[in-house]
């Protein structure tokens, strides 16, 4: 297994943060996290999405630009990195959240700013996509008991969940290990975690699927 830069992705509530943290601990790697709770515009976005989505997405963009710098430095040092977000994940959120019509086309403005500011993005050696049903992600958010579930705008979670599926159906920039997140609990089940490690080690080609029934 010769991965230096691993990304764990999945819809909100899929368990990507827990899995990326465990992988980082296992490999003694730098854990790079998106930490949406640090976004000062996020609460305002949840209360009034149409007025605050652009500010929220620009904040995440600046974080991703900083992440590129961190990844490049760590790769130069030959250090391993495990991240809980894909640098291109704005392609999932921006089309849903920002207006794409005149006057004031926010999507166009966002992509123009990104084109000007974003350096060349490093490509992961492996992306682990936790593919979960909407019901499972919803339960995952309920278990967190942090009140976040009640803050999302109506229909937001469903749209994000659908867009994740569409995005990874088309994604070809890096090898993808697609994991059935409905069946596996990597945070609490050591056997499931070992299955994942074996699948990572045996990964061949650009796309592989891991299901509990086939592991």
Language model features with spans:
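Conserved lysine of the Walker
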Residues: 16
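NTP-dependent small-molecule kinase module
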Residues: 139-215
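Conserved substrate/cofactor phosphate-moiety recognition/catalytic segment
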Residues: 25-63
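Hydrophobic anchor at the beta1->P-loop junction of P-loop NTPases
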Residues: 8
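A basic- and aromatic-enriched beta-loop-alpha substructure that forms the phosphate/nucleotide-
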Residues: 64-102
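A glycine- and Lys/Arg-enriched "phosphate-lid" helix/loop adjacent to the NTP-binding pocket
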Residues: 90-162
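P-loop (Walker A) phosphate-binding loop of NTP-binding proteins
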Residues: 11
